[in-house]
Amino acid sequence: PSLEIVKEACINFEIPHNGIIFDPTLESWAKQGVLMINSALTCEVNKVGSHTMMWRPFMTKLLKNLSEWQTGIIYVLFGEQAKTLKPYINKNTNIILEEKHPAYYARQEERMPSTVFQEVSKLTKERYGEPIVWFSEY
């Protein structure tokens, strides 16, 4: 359900659109430099978060090295688990945004606000000249 929540937030159905094409593989996002990664890359079946501590050393080193070697990255930390990784991101040369995890909105049966996606697009346009295209219209 998290991807569906993200889809609704980035499309922002409060604004009228023509026909919408959303790439569920997120390949179109990857081509624009967007990487969506969880704080744990695996888990036991039906046990969300069961491998979080196993992946913790890898994720902390990944974020620390990435944020030191590549500056100007816009990090979006979704949820409390992701926010615990914030100290490993160099905030002096990168931007860190925070939002509740999409699963929170699914549990609450609420719509996730589109503000974080709008902010990423705004910052990307300011820094690199082009906003992120979260979906296509036809």
What label would you give each PLM region?
Residues 107-109, 113-138:
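C-terminal functional extensions of proteins
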Residues 94-102, 133-138:
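Short flexible/disordered coil segments
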Residues 1-74, 82-89, 95-98, 104-107, ...:
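A polyanion-binding, active-site-adjacent surface
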